[in-house]
Amino acid sequence: MPTPSSAHMHDFEVVSNKEIAQGIFSLVISAPKLASTLKPGQFVNIAVPGDASSLLRVPLSYYRADAEAGTVEIWYAVVGDDTRRLSQMGPGSTSDLLGPGGHGWNVPADCNRALLVAGGIGVPPVLCLAEDLSRRCIAFDVCVGAACGDKVVGLDGFKAAGAGEVVLCTDDGSAGQKGFVTDPAAKMLGLGKYGYVASCGPAIMMQKVAQAAAENDVYCEVSLERMMSCGFGACNTCNVETVDGMKGACMCGPTFDASKVVVF
């Protein structure tokens, strides 16, 4: 059953909004109440001003919440009109959002070492988890994938968080290993040293990571991306097909037990 929505309306002000990789931006907003309640793996649903015909909010995972500073940092890719307008919001710009949305990562209590697998703009919620694991003294290794070197984000963050091993793969070989990140991830899972796997990125990547985790009897969670209209369970536009029926990503996700997901 979905948990009751914990989302509330929050006004925010842009602190900074800058490009950190090709087509990928870091947005830092001031939203003190939100910053104190977000948990790793949750998301926010942002109203982007500038187009009266655009009625839907933009659902985005977050990277870091600083309760002391009252700020939230969100990484996003410019992929359409809404995110293009979001990228044009400068310091001092204001709007509102709904959050925190959904529920976050659920790391098993007996996990001693985790494997984190992130691809493309799926890095932020995984990096957020990495920093949380570090605070909890849980060891972790990381596999990061991107289309090319110009689109890689998060490597320094994973290293700073204390990752044991960091493997980078790019489709074109312009940075790290050439190929798909699922290959080294599957090999690492075969070593039998992980108690948990978390993955976010392209659907096919998460599907293959989930398959490798199942083959090695390792509990795996995935953070799924879906278009949303409301973000609090009323519209049924973000449904995920699972073995237990259709589940809304906004309420039952965005993180799911990978073994129960039918369509990633």
Question: Where do the PLM segments sit?
Answer:
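FNR/FR-type flavoprotein reductase catalytic core
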Residues: 81-224
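Short microdomains enriched in Cys/His and/or Lys/Arg
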Residues: 251-264
